[in-house]
C-alpha cells in the first residue's frame, strides 16, 4: 500500500456528524461523481480506485440519508491497472443531490455553497473529501515533499486553494493533465494539512520522518563543511610547504629572519597540523593562530618574489 493510500485509509475511519459528512460528500461527489438517468429517474455514480473510499461513501449515504447504494467493481486487466469501484445510488439520488446543493440542470455544479465556507469544520471536512477524491502525497522517506489535489475544473481548484489558504498553508495552483491541481511543497504545511483534515497518525509519522531527514541533512551539511575546511587547510598547507622548500633550495632557510626561519622549520617538521597547533610547536612560541598565519603569508610572499626574480633573469 502506498503512503498516500495509508493516509486515505486513516481518513476513511474518521467519525463525523451530519454537517461535516455532508461537506465531505459534497467534495467526493462533485469531484468523482457523475449523473445518469435510468427508468426515468436520476442515478448517481461516484467512482474511485480505492475500496476504502468506496465503503466510506456507501456508509455516509446510508448513515445520514438512510439510502441503500451498491458498489460495482470493474476489474481492469490491461496494464494491471487498479480496479474501479463505483458507488451507485439508483433511488433517492435526486433527494441526496438536492440536499447537498450540488445539482443544477441535471449537472453537478462546480461552485461550492457560500455558507459552507463560513464554517471552519465544514471546510476541513470538504478538504478531507477533496483529498480522498483527488489527492496524493509523496512518501516523505523516499521522495521530495509534495502534496496535491487534482480537480477537473479551474474554478473549483481555486476554491480548494482558497480553503487551504484560510489555514495559512500557502497553497499554489497550476494546470495539469487536462485539469488543475492545488499543491503544497513545504513539509510543515503538508503536516498541518494532514492534521486539519483529520489524518493525525499520518501527520505524526510524517513529522517523525521529517525530523530524521532534517537531522540527516544537517549532519551531511556539517560533514561537507568540515570536509571543505579540511581540503582548504590541506591545500594551504601544501602551498606553504612548497614555498618553504623553494626558499630553502634557493637561498636556504638560514638566510631568513629568526621568526620566519622558526615557523618555516616547524611547518616542514609538522606538515599535517593546524595553524593553532603549529603555533604551540614553534621553539620560540607559543604563537597565536593569527601570528602563525601572518608569518606564513610573509614566507609565501617571499617565495613569490624569488620566483619573480628568476623569471626576470
Curated annotation (Swiss-Prot):
Record's keyword annotation contains Cell division: yes
Signal peptide: none
Pfam families named among the record's database cross-references: HTH_WhiA (PF02650), LAGLIDADG_WhiA (PF14527), WhiA_N (PF10298)
DNA-binding region: 274-308
Protein keywords: Cell cycle, Cell division, DNA-binding
A Gene Ontology molecular function term of the record: DNA binding
Family indicated by similarity: Belongs to the WhiA family.
Role this protein plays: Involved in cell division and chromosome segregation.
Name of the protein: Probable cell division protein WhiA
Organism: Limosilactobacillus reuteri (strain DSM 20016)
Amino acid at each position: 500500500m502506498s503512503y498516500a493510500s495509508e493516509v486515505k485509509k486513516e481518513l476513511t475511519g474518521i467519525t463525523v456528524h451530519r454537517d461535516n459528512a455532508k461537506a465531505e460528500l459534497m467534495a467526493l461527489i462533485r469531484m468523482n461523481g457523475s449523473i445518469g438517468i435510468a427508468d426515468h429517474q436520476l442515478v448517481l455514480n461516484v467512482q474511485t480506485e480505492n475500496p476504502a473510499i468506496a465503503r466510506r461513501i456507501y456508509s455516509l449515504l446510508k448513515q445520514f440519508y438512510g439510502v441503500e447504494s451498491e458498489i460495482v467493481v470493474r476489474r481492469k486487466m490491461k496494464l494491471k491497472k487498479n480496479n474501479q469501484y463505483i458507488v451507485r445510488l439508483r433511488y433517492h439520488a435526486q433527494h441526496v443531490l438536492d440536499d447537498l446543493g450540488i445539482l443544477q440542470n441535471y449537472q453537478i455544479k462546480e461552485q461550492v455553497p457560500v455558507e459552507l465556507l463560513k464554517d471552519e469544520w465544514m471546510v476541513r471536512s470538504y478538504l478531507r473529501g477533496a483529498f480522498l477524491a483527488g489527492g496524493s502525497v509523496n512518501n516523505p522517506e523516499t521522495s521530495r515533499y509534495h502534496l496535491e489535489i487534482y480537480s477537473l475544473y479551474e474554478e473549483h481548484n481555486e476554491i480548494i486553494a482558497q480553503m487551504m489558504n484560510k489555514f495559512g498553508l500557502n497553497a499554489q495552483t497550476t494546470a495539469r493533465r487536462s485539469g488543475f491541481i492545488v499543491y503544497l511543497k513545504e513539509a510543515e504545511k503538508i503536516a498541518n494539512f494532514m492534521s486539519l483534515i483529520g489524518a493525525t497518525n499520518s501527520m505524526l509519522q510524517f513529522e517523525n520522518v521529517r525530523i530524521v531527514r532534517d537531522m540527516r541533512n544537517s549532519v551531511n551539511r556539517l560533514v561537507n563543511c568540515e570536509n571543505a575546511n579540511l581540503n582548504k587547510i590541506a591545500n594551504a598547507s601544501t602551498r606553504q610547504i612548497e614555498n618553504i622548500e623553494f626558499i630553502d633550495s634557493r637561498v636556504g632557510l638560514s638566510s631568513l629572519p629568526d621568526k620566519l626561519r622558526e615557523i618555516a622549520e616547524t611547518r616542514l617538521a609538522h606538515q599535517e597540523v593546524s595553524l593553532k597547533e603549529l603555533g604551540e610547536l614553534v621553539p620560540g612560541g607559543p604563537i597565536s593562530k593569527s601570528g602563525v598565519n601572518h608569518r606564513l603569508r610573509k614566507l609565501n610572499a617571499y617565495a613569490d618574489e624569488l620566483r619573480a626574480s628568476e623569471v626576470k633573469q
